[in-house]
Amino acid sequence: MTAALWLGLSGVLSAAAQAAPLSHDVTIGYVQIADDSRYDDKEGPAETTIAPPRPLPGAEMAVDEVNIDAATVGRLDKLDHEEAGSADALTAQVDAMAAKGEHWFLIDAPDEAMETLAKAERDKDVILFNISARDDALRGGACQPELLDVIPSRAMLADALAQFLVARKWPNVLVLRGPLPDDKKDAAAFASAATRFGLRIADTRDFIVSNDPRHRDQDNIALLTGGASYDVVYVADADGTFARSLPYATIRPRPVIGATGLVPTAWSWTWERYGAPQVSHRFKKRVGRDMTATDWAAWLAVRALDDALRESHATSTEAADKYLLGPQMNIDGAKGPPLSFRAWDHQLRQPILLTTPDATIADAPMPGFLHQTNVLDTLGYDRPETKCKF
């Protein structure tokens, strides 16, 4: 990063006010939404229901871990967990906590709520760590200087799959797209990745899950996967009901990727390198379940903040933020290369794991994909492509 660019960035971060003094002990805000539909019970196999877990335990584990080292310098990190009653109440909740002196916040909120919050907090003395919203717009036209995206974007996940297909020489893809808004966003991200990496979309077909005979053509896997030539099937299905039955049911014997089969993710218990098994084991021993991608994002956000505080010896929040977003930041995320935030959109650059339920098959960037400065920037929107303007 050039000196001029960094001076411009630091000016944006400090536009709201003079640097706030840094308390010896640090309280990290954590805010989630009570009625977040992403955590509603979802239909599972054999008439079961599945309740997706919230990522709070990841942050709690990280706070306990960093306090072991922080205690040696007399610092204690605390987590202030609050719940907004609704998406509309999210900004008021963050503002109330900021009024108590809290500066750093982990935010677990869906795309639209995150965008509204980040816009409302622009030029305020806060930093928001996005640990669960994947919308590309948050890293693009709706970006804000106070928003740091820890969870990977849809574009990063799609690019990882596209690189894998190129590496395996499976260039022809049949896309099956569900009816939900997230399905359409995921399919659009994959289509963009396909164009970027030279894949060919053989066809895009919409499915719905229904017992209505009028929708037979959109609910029958054999019909949906017949009549086209392709190497692999990509399925966009946010709730997973359709995707669950897709592998081994396609009319042609082809692998399935996307929402099932080979799935791109920030974290998996099957990842066995760079200290990852120890992280996964500590989490499972503590919480009683496997660590998810959002658990990892919450854990990583706390670890990143601790690294910035410890390495910078900052005496103000502004100085800590400058280090956190600076070129010298190297975060150990148990995924191999050091992680850091991109200057142009504040997305955390990171490898993407390509996993099945039982194994990590590959981690992207795939070998052979090169970049002039950082190979991790082959995933997601690079500086020349970004629509983000702080």
Per-range role (PLM):
Residues 17-390:
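Extracytosolic ligand-binding ectodomains
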Residues 2-14:
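Bacterial N-terminal signal peptides
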